[in-house]
Amino acid sequence: MEHAVPDDALARGLEYLRRNGTELMGVLAAHSAGIASGDDVLVHLRPYQNDDGGWERFDGDMEGSLSTISQTWLGLQWLLWTRPSDTTPLDRTVEFLRRSQHDDGYWDEPEEILKYDPPPWMIPGDFSNRLWLTSAVCCKLLELGREAAVGLDAAIEYLRKGWDGSRFPGGQHTHWMAVYIFASLSEPTDLDRRIARGCASRLIDELSKGIGDALDVTSIAYVAFRSGTRDLFDVAFPIVVGNQAEDGGWTTGYDDIHRPQCTIEAMHLIKMV
């Protein structure tokens, strides 16, 4: 099934970000539009990577310069999408994630984050938060082909323990990440196949009912495309296309501060498809 995209979608998105985004958001959009290189992007990415290899301060969800898992996986995503010729930032990011993995296989935010009044999805010690952070890291490392750098088997086993037969605790994040993770394993078990299919079916049902923020729907369409989960993609992608607003940017219910990121992710998906 083919899905129509307006011819000017990328140009309108780029113009929106030139008016409303930071320099980083603008160059990421230019990369998505095919007019900036990964090396151009890296110039603007570098200030967000800390000395320990972790990343901070991308999305405005909290103050401070602490390296967090939720920001580091986003930095990993930008490096994955833009592929700068200097791989040192990527290597440092992967090493930070290797050091940050807990013995039981999961990732969690550091306790120090509590000093900065983080949002609920960044509170350490919460099982559902650990699941989505672990799934986020695994998803991007698998896509990069760098999963051997961490204890992937332990991380996957931790995720399996969160599956109750029909869903993971928490929101949609762990579910859409799990679609890609459990479809990408070289030797999946029957449980892994059930998890991948169960997550896809759940997301299809929720999207069909209008459940899901625009930013998350873009991520869902992305992993569906990358994993070859066509039925999920056929539901999610038309919603993504329809979420472009009159001003050229993509909508999100999280907050206007997240619209530039939402716009970049939608542009990248459209270019890739």
Residues of each region from the PLM?
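Preference for long, amphipathic alpha-helical scaffolds in soluble/luminal domains
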Residues: M1-V273
